[in-house]
Amino acid sequence: VHASDAVTPAPRLVTTRCPICGEEGTDREVYPANFDPAALDSAVFSARRTPDRLHYRMVRCVRCGLLRSNPILPLEDLSRLYGASRFTYQREAEFTGKTYATYLRRALAGRPWPRSLMEVGCGSGFFLSEAARMGIEEVSGVEPSQEAIEHAEPRLRDRIRCALYDSETFEAERFDVICAFQVFDHVPDPAGMLRACFRHLRPGGMVLFINHDSGALTNRLLGERSPIVDVEHTALYDRSTMRRILEVTGFTVQQVFGVKNTYPLEYWTRLAPLPSLVKDPLLKALERSRVGELPVSLYAGNLGAIATKERPQ
C-alpha cells in the first residue's frame, strides 16, 4: 500500500440504494466482500490493471435485477483514490479510441452532425483525439486522474477538467453528444450522473455509453471469477437494467447492443481468468515475441447504449 494514497486504517463504508428503484432493503446477497478496505490504494483504482479478484459485497435488487456493490467507500475516498490513480494503458489506448470512434460513427448515422462532444472519464483524451479527427469542432473531457491528463496531446490538455463529473461541472445545455466508456459501472451515484448528463445535453442531444454487460454469456458462466466482479465497480448492468436506468432518468433509449472490442492478444491474455502459474509465464512469452501485439477482435461481455434527450413538444 502506498502511504500517500491509501484509505484510512478503518474506512467507513456507506450503504447504497438501488439507483433504478430508489430503495434500500430490496436486495439479496450474491457475493460476500473478500478484501480488507484498509488495504485499498490508488493502484487498485487504476484503469485496466491486471484483475486481482477483489470486490465489495455484491447484491442483486429483487425488483429490477440490478447487480451492485453494497456497501462501498464514500465519495471522498473514491475521489482521492481515482485522483491518485496511475495511467498504465497507453499501449491499449490507440485500439480503444478507434473502437469507440467506430461506435460513435454508427450512433450518429442519420443524425445531424454534432458541433460539441464531452467525454466523462476521458483518461488521456485518446477518444477525444479521434472525435476531433472526425470533424467535431468542440471536444471536452472530465477526468479525475491528473497523471492521465498529463499524457494527453498538448492541444487537448486545456480541454480536460481534472475533476469528478457532476451536474455543476458545466453549464446546462452545453453539448450535442456526451460519451462515457467503461466509466458508468464505476460511478457511486449512477442516477445522479445520468441526471447531470441530461442537464448538460442540448435538446435533441445524445448519450453513447459502453460498459460491462453482466448478462453476457461469458460473465454469467464465470460468475464471481469474471473480471467485471471488481472493487472498482459500484454497479453492473445487463441490457434490461441499462435500458431502465436511462429511462427513469428521463432519456429515450434508442438502442442497447453488444460491443465488439479490438485489443492486442497480450491484453486479452492479461484479462483471462487463468491461474497465475499459467498466466504469468504466458504473458512473459507474449511480451518477448511480437505475437502479443496481434490485434484480436472479440465480443467480450460489453454492451453499448444510445439514448436521447427529446426536444420539448
Predicted regions and their residues:
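Conserved N-terminal segment of class I S-adenosyl-L-methionine
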Residues: 1-173, 177-181, 191-194, 257-261, ...
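Conserved catalytic loop of SAM-dependent methyltransferase domains
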Residues: 32-38, 254-279
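Short, glycine-/aromatic-enriched active-site segment of Class I SAM-dependent methyltransferases
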Residues: 33-35, 39-42, 209-235, 240-246
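Short glycine/proline- and charge-enriched loop/turn segments
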Residues: 39-45, 83-90, 222-230, 269-276
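A short hydrophobic/small-residue beta-strand
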Residues: 138, 207-208
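A short His-aromatic
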Residues: 182-186
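Short N-terminal helix/helix-N-cap motif within the alpha/beta-hydrolase-1
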Residues: 188-192, 219
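A short glycine-rich, Lys/Arg-flanked "PGG" loop and its adjoining helix->strand segment in the class I
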Residues: 191-206
